[in-house]
Amino acid sequence: VDKVSFLQEKSAFHMKYPEQSDLSFYRWFTQQHPDEAIGWYHLGQAREAQGDTRQALAAYRQSLFAKQGPYYDEARDAYQKLLREQSRQGWRNRARLLLASLAFLYAQFVFSPGPLQDGAPAASAQPQAVPASAPAPVQPHVEVIAVPATLSPKELQSQVRRYVEARRPALAQPYTVLVVPEVPGSPLFTPLLFYQPKQVLGVLQYNPVSRTVISQRWFGSPASFDAGATLAAARGDLAVEQQTLQHVLTLRNSLYRYYQQKGTLPASLADLAGSYPGNYLPQVPLPPKRLLLKSYPYHPHAFQSGSAWASLRDVLPLPGYPEPLSPLAPLQVRLSQKSHTLQLVSGTHLVRSYPAAIGKNDSTPEGYYTILQKINQPRGHDNIYGTRGLVFQGNGYAIHGTNHPESIGTSVSLGCVRLFNAAVEELYTFVSLGTEFIISNAPVPAQPWSNPALFILPAGPEEETPNVIYTWLH
């Protein structure tokens, strides 16, 4: 339904029911067209105008689970804005309570008997100077692309040559292309940023400045990527580039979610690695040694609220490598109940794919959620929750590990989502508070995917809740 059709339906509704309000129309429209974001957005606007924040958030959330269309982006912005306002209101209430307590204590102190002595004058607070660091040296760039299985050797080499010759002019250094067999469900001739090759059909090094092939080798049949000296350099270069991309994506997503919830960026990256319940990240990742950086550069002054995500490229730049041609996007967790698969995605990029156990009898709730809490070593009888927990709904629903790994891939829980412990530890590393989680019953086929080496940042005792025994719907 486009905007014109929506307005026409609204006009027809009021002509037929002149005594009904706009709110009545929006409620009627969402019942007739539950998959259209435009109706849920306007219903949310009407609820918000009435001051009914809970109903407004529910409507905005439903619009984000609808198909993309008119007002989808507006609904997303309104949803996040209302969440931020709720968070700020909570802080204001707590601040008022704190100020009242301080005022009472001050009055007790001022009017109490006894001599008072002036203390030493307090030093004025000054912002910490961040030492400037040299940019990271340019690193060997590697791209992994999948190609159709039907190409002859001659066609394959010709099409890969056309691929490298058509690359963006921003690439000014020689780079390597790893050609892998077709990955079902993934695009062809498109960089697969977070795919770990098992087999390769060929490797080519290209100079985009002189537009010449520096070296190339083609295998008559798929060759193992993990063996042989020929691919040793490419293996090492790809591993470091993927590690750097993962670090930067994790940090940018955490900064973005922090801004969505608090309306500002943290003073330093270290503020992201707080204690529970403010633990956006378990730790701040350190750059790979070959980048020659002590820490990732952070420039919060470069942030622009009008283009929050896009400006994070300047706030936290990708050191040593070109930005991906298909831009990175905020991380999102998606669960397909039909295929028992949980995926971590960044826009068009599949970052990770894990098999999952879900609720029996459709007890895992379909819908749009956000990560509310992250708990290290969640307590439960017999270690039923494994090593990590990510709560996405306040009444007992979480993504967690398991002490029954044989259950993964089945419908056996009371509603929670189970992962292997190593998988939930990696997801816990990637995913910050506020990250979106979408659960769908749509029949999405399982996509075979080869994850890179595990990316796990150790979680400390400050992220544990030792005095809480959880009763999640495991």
Name each model-derived stretch.
Residues 9-10, 43:
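Structural register within alpha-helical repeat arrays
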Residues 129-239, 260-330:
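Extracellular/periplasmic head regions of type IV pilus-like filament subunits
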Residues 221-223, 260, 381-474:
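Exported/periplasmic cell-wall-interacting domains
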Residues 311-407, 469-474:
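Gly/Pro-biased beta-strand-loop elements
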